[in-house]
Amino acid sequence: MSIYKPAIGIDIDGVIGDSDKVFRKYIKKYLGINLRREDVKDFYYEKVLGIPENEMKNFWKRIDEEKRWLEIEILPGAKTALKYLKEKYQIIIITARPKNIRNLTEEWISKNQIYYDRLYFIEEHKGESKLSAILSNSINLKCFIEDRIDFALDFIKEGIKVILFDYPWNRIEKNIDSELLIRVKGWQEALSYL
């Protein structure tokens, strides 16, 4: 007899892995622009850098081809937190990473021994959202752990609690008055809300 466990949704980049650190490293190497984390005040690097979208696409293509995704380090406390959470919840990882790097993502998850029950990739360029992935798969979420404010707002509108890892790129929406949005500095604080 299986015991029902509620589900929580979790993003990869900015929540489980410190992808921004790797992206900034290669922005400096490939584009010659030095960015600090506090400089990244928008989720889209091309807006932060003031460069054409096409130039950023070439950057991402190079990141993909050189498998730089595998260099991303786990955020402090993430692995321990997921180990703890798996006892109480179904872990649903939903990422907006492109599907063409699915194998790299799965390799990264395996290499880092990240526990999860289900993994979904959304195709944002085709109008998919993390919320639509949840709704179309009839997943009843207790909460979602995220770093992108636009995805967080989608969940809040549906009455789903969001634990938002606080970064400069998600502070653009200043006046969000919702008990469903909880900003945290890291995993230890996030766990106190679960």
Residue ranges with predicted function:
Residues 1-58:
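Active-site neighborhood of HAD-like aspartate-dependent phosphohydrolases
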Residues 127-132, 171-179, 192-194:
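Short, charged, surface-exposed secondary-structure boundary motifs
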